[in-house]
Swiss-Prot record:
Belongs to the pseudouridine synthase RluA family. InterPro entries: PsdUridine_synth_cat_dom_sf, PsdUridine_synth_RluA-like_CS, PsdUridine_synth_RsuA/RluA, RluA_PseudoU_synthase, S4_RNA-bd, S4_RNA-bd_sf. This is RNA pseudouridine synthase 2, chloroplastic. PROSITE patterns: PSI_RLU, S4. It catalyses: a uridine in RNA = a pseudouridine in RNA. Keywords: Chloroplast, Isomerase, Plastid, RNA-binding, Transit peptide. It comes from Oryza sativa subsp. japonica.
Length: 445
């Protein structure tokens, strides 16, 4: 069960230390897409009526690449032609992969296909699809609630908001039921699928519950809003604290605090390896990995076109197995998609269980097994095999109440799957005491 402190809470560091002390005592006892609309024009600026192809609704673009124009990627060329219609590059790429783009009479499927002067391009951009979310009686671990907001301890493996193909079982479905809000239908905003998404792991969203008490809202609002109540997000695999706004004023005030970076956010993670030095600040921009759209990359020097400023502070709380793993605390200055995960990979310490960013089971074992006695290798293998998500938990959250102005801070211990791995690492490390000094747990205060 999550623990809370409101109005006059202990300092975040004190609260986190208390959580860690509890875990140490416990372990010591054990020793022994939605889509957007677009308008298109042909080379003569003549409007083209919407049409359908292959069952997909959309607006067509049919145009010749001007003679003498240099070679261009097909996705970039279409994006330049339709940019005024608010069409994202990601939506164009999805249309290409769906076989809805034809060059000189032949369908193309690669977004990197090159076009040149004289080529005839025919394109049907995927049409916007509505998202519908139903209230669902899903248990919520509510840490705090009043008339204006609630703070929820999100379990790992729960998606925060509905998306095409994933409209049920989300935190939004649970909130709709808890707050007794009827079904709503809305359209996904462009940024969700953009190459450079504005929303992120722990950044602001742009809506609140009140705006979705009915299924009918203006097209302008529907294009901007999609997930009721959620002010910021956590990845599906991340557990921990989220604040949810119940009214427009609360949402606006909380969103402003996120923009001003006055929200206090502390995460804890288990990593593959230990960072050196054991504390520091990372200020490295983050962008979408051009080779893998589900992954972000830290890009020093901001050379990437879509890179966005990102800054994180980290501190090692404990080191296990002579550096085979570590408990690392993170404090976010910005909130980009996968920020902690991308920065951890950049430091060479991917999160334990984060297969997307290199924290694979094989990597974890390659770091831990050589540093622990052989009698614990079987236990280590069993422990690692059970990890099914990145070991990342949003442990502490602090902000100013949007109505009263009081400072609220909340702490929440990590869930069982996280603590089981933490306890196992404690056991292996403490029981290895005397193994050439490499197995002694090192606590960093």
């Amino acid at each position: 069960m999550a623990t809370t402190a409101a109005a006059s809470p202990p300092a975040i560091a004190t609260a986190l230390s208390a959580l860690l002390r509890r875990q140490r005592r416990r372990s010591s006892r054990c020793v022994g897409a939605s889509h957007a609309r677009c308008l298109a024009a042909d080379a003569n600026a003549e409007a083209v009526a919407p049409s359908r192809r292959g069952g997909h609704g959309g607006t067509r673009l049919e145009e010749a690449v001007p003679a003498g124009e240099g070679r261009s990627r097909i996705d970039a060329w279409i994006s330049a032609r339709l940019g005024g219609g608010g069409v994202s590059r990601a939506r164009i790429q999805a249309s290409i992969r769906a076989g809805l783009v034809v060059v000189n009479g032949r369908p193309v499927s690669k977004v990197s296909h090159m076009v040149k002067g004289g080529d005839i391009v025919s394109c049907t951009v995927l049409e916007l699809q509505p998202l519908r979310a139903e209230p669902e009686d899903i248990p919520l671990d509510i840490v705090y609630e009043d008339d204006h907001l609630l703070v929820v301890n999100k379990p790992a493996h729960m998606v925060v908001h509905p998306a095409p193909g994933n409209a049920n079982g989300t935190l939004v479905n649970a909130i709709l039921h808890h707050c007794k809000i009827s079904t709503f239908t809305c359209l996904a905003r462009n940024s969700i699928d953009d190459e450079c998404p504005d929303s992120s792991d722990d950044d602001i969203d742009v809506f609140d519950i009140d705006q979705f008490t009915t299924g009918e809202v203006s097209s302008e609002v529907r294009e901007a809003l999609v997930r009721p109540g959620i002010v910021h997000r956590l990845d599906k695999g991340t557990s921990g604290l989220l604040v949810v706004a119940k009214d427009e004023h609360s949402h606006a005030q909380l969103a402003e605090q996120f923009k001003l970076h006055t929200i206090r956010r502390v995460y804890i993670s288990l990593t593959c390896g230990a960072p050196n030095p054991n504390s520091g600040r990372i200020e490295v921009p983050i962008a979408r990995d051009p080779n893998n759209r589900i992954r972000m990359i830290a890009t020093p020097g901001s050379g990437h076109r879509y890179a966005r400023h990102a800054a994180s502070r980290y501190k090692v709380r404990e080191v296990f197995a002579g550096g085979g793993s570590a408990l690392v605390e993170w404090r976010l200055e910005t909130g980009r998609t996968h920020q902690i995960r991308a920065h951890a990979k950049y430091l060479g310490i991917p999160l334990l269980g984060d297969e997307t960013y290199g924290g694979t089971k094989s990597m974890a074992l390659s770091l831990l097994r050589p540093r622990t006695p052989s009698r614990y290798h079987c236990d280590l293998s069993n422990m690692i095999s059970k990890i099914d998500r990145p070991c990342l938990h949003a442990a502490l959250l602090g902000f100013k109440h949007p109505h009263s102005g009081k400072i609220l801070e909340f702490s929440c211990p990590p869930p069982d799957d996280f603590t089981e791995v933490l306890n196992e690492l404690h056991q292996v490390t403490l029981a290895s005491n005397g193994n050439s000094g490499g197995g002694v747990a090192r606590i960093c205060d």
